[in-house]
Amino acid sequence: MPSKLLKDGRAYALQAREKINGAWVPSSYVNHPALVADAFHPDNPIYQNTIFTRDVSKMPLHPNSAGMAAWMHKNSPDPWGTAWVKGQKGGGWGAKTALNSSAFGTQPIAAYVVDSTHPATEYAWMECKTDGMSTVGWDATPTPQGPKGIVAVQKIISGLIPLPTGALPAQNGDRGMSLYDIGSGIWREYFDVHGPLPDRKGPNGEPVYTAGVGGFSVNDPGRDISRTNPAAQTQSGQSAVACMHNSLGFIHPDEVRAGKINHALAFTFGAVAATSADYDAQGRVIRLHGTPSWPAAASDAKAPPSEAPNSPTHGQWGRVRKDVDPMHNPLTGLPYNPLTRMLIVAAQKYGIVGTDTNAFVHAFNTHSGVPEMLATGKTTDPWAVNGEIAKILNPAEPHKAFDISDFPWHLTEWGIRDWGRPLVDFYPRRAALNSNVDPYISPEYR
């Protein structure tokens, strides 16, 4: 059952019970009761009041906004890939815009929302190697277990975590997984997740998972984290390069059922330009550097730095022009495809933001169908080709329902870099452990 926030700040999930032989006992038909199945429903979502719901109608535009729109349209599929640094031809192919889901394509980060205050919460055992791009300035005081800051992080990203039995990370690509606990307020992110491992059990028989990288933020319990984390940033680590809880910008089956998306759309760049590069003595590229825009904290831009003046960057907000009519595509004279129409409406009000790179084609992402399958007991992914969501979007031709290749990148507008960044920002760009990076102080404030 959904959680409710009590006045003292604690979040509880309701536990269903049934009367058997005169006694009230936990219901036998409740699947994974601590799983908050309606967390992304547009009527009471966990992204409420965060940066993903800010109005973009008055967003100040970048001086080269038009050039960026043209660049985004031109450079998907990605014409460079990663081979250009070796002087080789590479890049992507196919449609200009793709949709990724748990049923097809490169699977996006799988997000699970739980309420660990529920008495029947299920747990898993996580072994995570590192928090990756650490917050600058972790306490390096030596302890028998290692540097004090790293030891503290491990207590959050490793060990027992509240995760429903049967949970799966993305099954290909980055194998990402998010775990948002609205009972404690701890939101975790993981990259390169494997599990549940068939040949291992945790200390108390729990399923075991491993992750190459993890991250987290500590927030107010409940569905509204905007007081403590309005920008939806991780405090350390990540599941994707932006170091954000970017699955808040994914498309959920409940949103298609409701016919509305009430948040900005987090997409994956096909191509995004690096801002600079390091070269060896022979002039060969040995390292690329990307500069993100707030609220992103890092970038893995892969396209040539010469493209940077026209390329948006990770974390930079964009929007679809308000004069775009979802029922009229000027390139075809026909209405945009059904799902594209939903994306256009959301992007006109809340915007779009690139939070990762695939060096292939621009792609929007859906929430994994696995959490819903666990909550309902259904065995078919709602995103299945010709499945439930496909038939809602396009009853006559459900096999075409997920075609968003007509998304109008050429009709987008791009905001200034760091739009909305606090005048004093104690959340610096990510860097190596103990790097000397000072908090950001706006010139307006100095």
Named regions from a protein language model:
Residues 9, 22, 184-185:
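Detector for glycine-centered tight turns/loop "hinges" at secondary-structure junctions
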Residues 12, 25-27, 208:
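Short, isolated positions in well-ordered beta-strands
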Residues 35-446:
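Short, surface-exposed polybasic-aromatic patches that bind anionic ligands, especially phosphate groups
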Residues 2-11:
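Surface-exposed, short loops/turns at beta-strand junctions within beta-sandwich domains
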Residues 18-20, 191:
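Residue-level signal for short segments within beta-strands and strand-turn junctions
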Residues 13-17:
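Extracellular recognition modules
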Residues 21-34:
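Extracellular fibronectin type III
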